[in-house]
Amino acid sequence: MLSNIWRRPKRLSFRYLAPIAHRSIAQTKNLVTKPENIRNTEGSENNDTVQSELPWYLRDDAASPLAETAQVELPEVPESAPKTINSFLELVAKDYGFDNLVFFDMTQLDSDHDYSTHHQPAKYILIASGKSEKHIMKAASQLRIHIKHTYDHLPSIEGMVTGGTSPRARRRMLRRSRKGPMATDNEYGKAANSWVMCETGVDGLFIHMLTADRRQELNLESLWCREEDAWRYEQQPAKAENSDHIFSGVRRFHTMGPFYMATKGKPLQKLLNSDSSIPGVELKGLISDFEKSGDSTSKFEFYRIIHLLDPNLVSLKSLANILISSKIPKIEAVVAYMKVLMDSQEIAAPEQTTAAMNESVDTRLDFLSQFVSDIYAYSGEQIELVGHPELVPLLWNLTVVNLKPHVIGSRTIDEAIHNEIEKEHFGNYPSVHIASNRNRDIYDLISSYNEAHSLTPTTSFKEMVLFTYGNAGKWDKFWSTFEVSFNLLNDQEHQTMTKWLRLVVYLDLRNDPVAINTFLNKYWSRSFPSSVTDLETRNFESEKEKDLFKTTIQSILQKVETPTSAEIQTTIDRL
């Protein structure tokens, strides 16, 4: 039955089309050979009718005249640039059809700029917009061939994806054919060849070819421009699109995060380091933009800056929740939170009174205790003081409140020894306040931990404790710490004059007459193991340190008068 219903049609043969073709050709000949159908050079009223009756392949070309090609404006090139730069500009604009060219001379950037020639290999950067991904791919291929034949080397091209598939890739895809597509196969709207970079290898020129949408999103110009031209490339936050596509949001958020801190985070950090302020309304706008970006990698850093600018917008509790929900190691989160506690205005002392500053230190430690309890809850882990090199110093500094912006520390001494610093920054008044009870508790905690684990405090930590007592004006503790911590009576570790050099440099910067008199009367005496006895048995690490020691002692002698000043000066002159 099925064979009667379903009959195979006869095979279509050319002989069925032959009569149709002959009739069409005959009609065409009649239309062309008739005198009334011959086109009049002066114009004929029936021309349109005749043209419509003719087959398409015999009609006159009715295309509209070509519009004048827009001239691409080439950017200005400095006279100091090589001649090859102009040739590449003309090649990209005129031969390859790119427009909106922007040229950056990286050699003219300041040495401290992040993208100056001191920090990266590019001397000149050209940015151009292509018409499509296919246009960019074709132009990049031609550019590679041009450089190969003109300059006799192959350039490095990144971001270009050709249509060809290597045999190795085909075999790999064949093996994966039964496993489904890889997650990386999804481009989330970032089409291949939307951004191609060519390192020409000619006079340090780098060429970036992008589609218009990709170029607007990346905003590469803001990275390489001068600071005074940054306003030219500022972009307004993109408005949310009303789309039913399932990746309408993912497409935008997929690569926006890393670029957010590059464009927004740096200005915020600079503002944080300056004395200027920013209105709360603008900060709320930045928070809204950041939430839309979906960036999770720099979330804590962003909100940390906002908190330091205005703690009313982001509280310490909110920062703690961000750290707890993040994926960073617990010990790293604790250190980051401790740094925030050091600078937070939310728990800062309202006035520089002993009671207010002690209460501020108590609040710091309470916040830290609660955070450590929350982040280590149900984990079965315990915080180790040696788990991070910054943990012990930060724990000590949490019990100290700075009274002045400039405080003498180990780094200050290093700068004074190796460079010249302005001593006017430091006065003879205490620059820090120590919460004595909490400070003693923390010191006992650190000492007990070291004793239980057979650890020895590092030299940097001992020096930090020493300078803290000196900065607070607690000279009794300062000298007792110096004798014990630096093992003055039986010093087998330090066989040079380095510790004495650092001590006299600190006393010179601290400029306290009481401390200077104690040093000259007690630690410059032959009746006690002192700097004088060490001068006879030990050497300086360099002649520069020796000269600095002499000039520093002379500076100290000018600040106070002691009966032994003449003897000390004689000893210094003999060095």
From Swiss-Prot:
A single GO BP: mRNA stabilization
UniProt keyword annotations, A-Z: Membrane, Mitochondrion, Mitochondrion inner membrane, Transit peptide
Residues of the transit peptide: 1-32
Q: Name one GO cellular component term.
A: mitochondrial inner membrane
**Source organism's superkingdom?**
Eukaryota
| Membrane topology summary | Peripheral membrane protein
- Compartment annotation: Mitochondrion inner membrane
Q: Which InterPro entries match?
A: Atp25 (IPR040152), NT_sf (IPR043519)
Q: Does the keyword Acetylation apply?
A: no
Q: Which cysteines are joined by disulfide bonds?
A: none
Q: Does the keyword Chaperone apply?
A: no
What is the predominant subcellular site recorded for this chain? mitochondrion
The similarity comment for this entry is: Belongs to the ATP25 family.
Q: What does this protein do?
A: Probable mitochondrial mRNA stabilization factor.
Q: What is this protein called?
A: ATPase synthesis protein 25, mitochondrial
